[in-house]
């Protein structure tokens, strides 16, 4: 399958690395890496399979848990002004965070992903070459920590 016949995208001033081949290669590695899910068993390609037109062929998507929506194809997604069936996201970068943090999809949090990214030397080098120094996981840890329910005292 090829998507090379799509028209060239208009410039995106919010994406400083959008035209860099190294950024695309790094993104492709992350897309297929199941290490970026809570269970380390679900990659973006688990639901957006290139051999299934970047969908999963299921009525309802399944990641680390269950979801209540069908997986949208990624073909042509860069041309959309809105993302998700209900249009709740208006940019690809903001949309991309949602499945990573959704309990039924990838099920993680930003601190977990920074830690995992930093733990793979090739990823650490790729990140640094594109964006500079990685975020300090300790400094931002409290902001990225998952919210947990707290019971009432007895």
Tell where the protein language model's regions lie, with residue ranges.
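Periplasmic c-type cytochrome electron-transfer domains
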Residues: 1-154
